[in-house]
Amino acid sequence: MGYDVHQLVAGRDLWIGGIKIEHELGLLGHSDADVLIHAICDAILGAANMRDIGYHFPDTSAETDGMDSKIILRDTIALIATKGYHLVNVDATICAERPKMNPHIPAMQQCMAEVIGTDPDNISIKATTTEKLGFTGRQEGISAYAVALIEK
């Protein structure tokens, strides 16, 4: 299972699922802070018993500063391939009060499927709110959860 969370701040672009979403706030992070891709990569790496994205793409590295998370996703797929695995499917949930994610889900699926080299039907993405509860409900951040099925 993968999980990630990033704080919403002014002055940053909002990248989720590999696409830029128009919004007055963006996610703060060392890379582009794509919370969905980060959760998916953690799920994929975890399924292969290969630790997490922080281990492979540390936020202390100059190489990952401002990195496009689609590169992290591409490289994660290459990493699991070194152990003979390939991705079967992903099931992910984005938790955000605003902006509404549902209109963007098909573009996210298409974008990530192209990076991974799979059919968009293998990338399940759902969106929910926290009914105005917690940091997500107060629009202080966005989180994402993911599980991945891999096979040899």
Language-model-detected regions and their locations in the chain:
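Short acidic capping loops at alpha-helix termini that bridge into adjacent secondary structure
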Residues: D119-N122
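Pyridoxal 5′-phosphate
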Residues: I125-T129
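Short, low-complexity, polybasic intrinsically disordered segments
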Residues: I105-Q109, Q139
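RNase III-family endoribonuclease catalytic core
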Residues: M1-P106, V115-I116
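C-terminal edge-of-domain segments
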Residues: T136-K152
